[in-house]
Swiss-Prot record:
PANTHER family xref list: FERROCHELATASE (PTHR11108), FERROCHELATASE, MITOCHONDRIAL (PTHR11108:SF1)
SUPFAM superfamilies: Chelatase (SSF53800)
Disulfide bond entries: none
Ranges that cross the membrane: none
One of the GO BP terms on file: heme biosynthetic process
Record-given protein name: Coproporphyrin III ferrochelatase
Keyword Kinase applies: no
Length: 316
């Protein structure tokens, strides 16, 4: 008997594929409002500073393919079939749902490549996927709200952080601090009771505990260029503050809200934060991003299988 096919909808933010895509990509992010030329030029300069266009597109596709492969290795009951849906560039989330529907997929598990829940991020992806499926009359989509607390995800980061601290001489370690960060969001999410900031705090606490790190702080990065207040402190300001007030001279940055090498990490951390550490005479460290690391892919696969099992349990 043929195995049942289950769709695997992997959703991510998306990134420009080539320089010509930058304008339309950021216009989509800005809800159809074209960015000023000055902003486009600045973005092009940032991409060039990290060696050309972001590697994110290739990494996202590789993560999705590896996840599909791992899921089909881990169990033999269903055949997972992967569909990639992006938020701000093709293939859009709606395109992926349409393809699932056209292929006759009846049910799918959806996972967003972002560990923490927020109405701005995971919620908006899931709503778009469900709305598209509803419009077409299928498939049924089982969404995942968050997965930051999956043990293998925390293990990935705590092992990487521990390795950096372990390699330091004792004196340096005493003056080193871990900065755990995620993408900043508008402050108004707090008034709405969004769990996003608390989830990042929880992630930082668990990683620090597992890595045996006593000095750590939570920061935010890559805030949008809008007049409204965004979550802070920004990682650059936090770096200066920790140096000035507590005398730290080594900084280990763990941008755990992201899962791959891309502009926010390769520029905002590896260029901007590094410049700050150089200005204050401190050392800069940043663990490797998860990308397609087998432990990270295992974490995602475990989350997907748990979600499918939960659906099965509820129908028994």
């Amino acid at each position: 008997m043929a195995k049942k096919t289950v769709g695997l909808l992997v959703m991510a933010y998306g990134t420009p594929y080539k320089e010509d895509d930058i304008e339309r990509y950021y216009t989509h992010i800005r809800h159809g409002r074209k960015p000023p030329q000055e902003q486009i030029d600045d973005l092009k300069a940032r991409y060039r500073a990290i060696g050309g266009l972001s590697p994110l597109a290739k990494i996202t596709e590789a993560q999705a393919k590896q996840l599909e492969k791992r899921l089909n290795e881990m169990q033999d009951e269903v055949e997972f079939c992967m569909y990639l849906g992006l938020k701000h560039i093709e293939p859009f989330i709606e395109d992926a749902v349409e393809r699932m529907h056209a292929d006759g997929v009846k049910e799918a598990v959806a996972i967003v490549l972002a560990p923490h829940y927020s109405t701005f991020s995971i919620c908006s992806y899931n709503e778009r996927a469900k709305a598209a499926a509803e419009k077409l009359g299928g498939p049924v989509i089982y969404t995942i709200d968050q997965w930051y607390d999956e043990p293998k995800f925390l293990q990935y980061w705590s092992e990487k952080v521990k390795a950096i601290f372990d390699a330091m001489k004792e004196r340096e370690r005493e003056q080193a601090v871990l900065i755990v960060s995620a993408h900043s969001l508008p402050e108004k999410i707090i008034q709405a009771g969004d769990p996003y900031p608390a989830q990042l705090e929880d992630t930082a606490k668990r990683i620090a505990e597992q890595a045996g790190v006593t000095h750590y702080a939570v920061g935010w990065q890559s805030a949008g260029n809008t007049p409204e207040p965004w979550l802070g402190p920004d990682v650059q300001d936090l770096t200066r503050q920790l140096h000035d007030e507590q005398g730290y001279t080594s900084f280990v940055y763990a941008p755990v809200g992201f899962v791959a090498d891309h502009l926010e990490v390769l520029y905002d951390n590896d260029i901007e934060c590094k410049q700050v550490t150089e200005e204050i005479g401190a050392r800069y460290y940043r663990p490797e991003m998860p990308n397609t690391d087998p432990l990270f892919i295992d974490a995602l696969a475990t989350v997907v299988l748990k979600r499918l099992a939960k659906e099965g349990d509820e129908h028994e």
